[in-house]
From Swiss-Prot:
InterPro entries: Asp/Orn_carbamoyltranf_P-bd (IPR006132), Asp/Orn_carbamoylTrfase (IPR006130), Asp/Orn_carbamoylTrfase_sf (IPR036901), Asp_carbamoyltransf_Asp/Orn-bd (IPR006131), Orn/put_carbamltrans (IPR002292). Belongs to the aspartate/ornithine carbamoyltransferase superfamily. OTCase family. It is found in: Mitochondrion matrix. GO terms for cellular component: mitochondrial inner membrane; mitochondrial matrix; mitochondrion. It comes from Sus scrofa (Pig). This is Ornithine transcarbamylase, mitochondrial. SUPFAM superfamilies: Aspartate/ornithine carbamoyltransferase (SSF53671). Keywords: Acetylation, Amino-acid biosynthesis, Arginine biosynthesis, Mitochondrion, Phosphoprotein, Transferase, Transit peptide, Urea cycle. The modification N6-acetyllysine is found at K44, K62, K118, K195, K205, K212, K281. Residues 1-6 form a transit peptide. The modification Phosphoserine is found at S107. It comes from the Eukaryota. Negatively regulated by lysine acetylation. Acetylation at Lys-62 negatively regulates ornithine carbamoyltransferase activity in response to nutrient signals.
C-alpha cells in the first residue's frame, strides 16, 4: 500500500480491543474526530445522523455507569440504535459457544461493545465476528477510558507531547491502557504501585520498548511521592476492581499512603491536574484534590461520550472531521 491521501487515517471495519494495536497517528485521529463531533454537536448544535440505520450490540458481564450511558446516548445521538444485554440475556461462552454468538451478532448488529471478565473472550469474538468488536473494559485493558483522558488533557494543556503522567495506585487495566499509548504521544510515565500490585510484566516490557522508540521515560516505583515528583497529571483509580471485592481488607492495607492529597500535589509540577475515571472512593483521593479547580474528573467523564462517538463513527463510517486538526 502507498501513502494514504493527505493524512486520511482509515479505521473503518477495525476492532478496538487494545491501544497496543493502534499507532499514535491512529489514536490522534480518533481524538481529532472526538473534538470535531463535540464542536459540531455541542457548540454549534448540529444534528449529525452519521449512524442512521445502524445497530450496536452492547454485552455487559459487569455493571457500568459511564460506559453504558456514554455509549447508549452517544450512539442514539448519531441516529443509531443501541441494544443493551446483561448476563441475564446473554452469557458469553455459557449458553452457546463464543463462535456461535459472534456469528449471530454479526448478522444482526453493525458493531458490538463488550464489557467482559476475560480479554481472551474479546479476542475470540473479534476473530469469529465479521463486524467491529470494541472493548468496553476487560481484566487487562480499558482503552475507551484512556481516549477520554487524552482528549481532556489536550483540551486543558493544548497539547500532549512532553507531559509527564504520574500514576499512583493499582497496576490495573486503566494503567495498562495508558502504558500502551502514552509514549506514542511523547508523554512520560511515572508509576507507583504497592509491592505485589505492579502492572503486568509483559505490558511493562512493551511500554519500555515504546518509550525507547519515542524518546520518552517510563519508571516504576513503590513510592507514591517519587512517581508524583514533577508530574503534570496525577492519576489514580479504584483500588478494588470489579470481581476483587473479597480482597478489600488486604488491598486497603496494601494501599496505605497511596491517597492523593495536596501533599502529593506539592511535589508535582506547578500546572498539575488530576484525573480519575470514577467511581471514586475518598480513600483514593481526598475531597480537597478531587473537588479542586485542578481536578478534571467531570470534563473527563463527559468526554467518555464524545470519544466513544468518535470510535463508532471511525469504525462504521467514511466521515472525515471538518474541524482543523488539534495540536497533540
Amino acid at each position: 500500500g502507498g501513502q494514504p491521501l493527505q493524512n486520511k487515517v482509515q479505521l473503518k471495519g477495525r476492532d478496538l480491543l487494545t491501544l497496543k494495536n493502534f499507532t499514535g497517528e491512529e489514536i490522534k485521529y480518533i481524538l481529532w474526530l472526538s473534538a470535531d463531533l463535540k464542536f459540531r454537536i455541542k457548540q454549534k448544535g448540529e444534528y449529525l445522523p452519521l449512524l442512521q440505520g445502524k445497530s450496536l450490540g452492547m454485552i455487559f458481564e459487569k455493571r457500568s455507569t459511564r460506559t453504558r450511558l456514554s455509549t447508549e446516548t452517544g450512539f442514539a445521538l448519531l441516529g443509531g440504535h443501541p441494544c443493551f444485554l446483561t448476563t441475564q440475556d446473554i452469557h458469553l461462552g455459557v449458553n452457546e459457544s463464543l463462535k456461535d454468538t459472534a456469528r449471530v451478532l454479526s448478522s444482526m448488529t453493525d458493531a458490538v461493545l463488550a464489557r467482559v471478565y476475560k480479554q481472551s473472550d474479546l479476542d475470540i469474538l473479534a476473530q469469529e465476528a465479521s463486524i467491529p468488536i470494541i472493548n468496553g473494559l476487560s481484566d487487562l485493558y480499558h482503552p475507551i477510558q484512556i481516549l477520554a483522558d487524552y482528549l481532556t488533557l489536550q483540551e486543558h494543556y493544548g497539547a500532549l507531547k512532553g507531559l509527564t503522567l504520574s500514576w499512583i495506585g493499582d497496576g490495573n487495566n486503566i494503567l495498562h491502557s495508558i502504558m500502551m499509548s502514552a509514549a506514542k504521544f511523547g508523554m512520560h510515565l511515572q508509576v507507583a504501585t504497592p509491592k505485589g500490585y505492579e502492572p503486568d510484566p509483559s505490558i511493562t516490557k512493551l511500554a519500555e520498548q515504546y518509550a525507547k522508540e519515542n524518546g520518552t521515560n517510563v519508571s516504576l516505583t513503590n513510592d507514591p511521592l517519587e512517581a508524583a515528583r514533577g508530574g503534570n497529571v496525577l492519576i489514580t483509580d479504584t483500588w478494588i476492581s470489579m470481581g476483587q471485592e473479597e480482597e478489600k481488607k488486604k488491598r486497603l492495607q496494601a494501599f496505605q499512603g497511596y491517597q492523593v492529597t495536596m501533599k502529593t500535589a506539592e511535589v508535582a509540577a506547578s500546572d498539575w491536574t488530576f484525573l480519575h475515571c470514577l467511581p471514586r472512593k475518598p480513600e483514593e483521593v481526598d475531597d480537597e484534590v478531587f473537588y479542586s479547580p485542578q481536578s478534571l474528573v467531570f470534563p473527563e467523564a463527559e468526554n467518555r461520550k464524545w470519544t466513544i462517538m468518535a470510535v463508532m463513527v471511525s469504525l462504521l463510517t467514511d466521515y472525515s472531521p471538518q474541524l482543523q486538526k488539534p495540536k497533540f
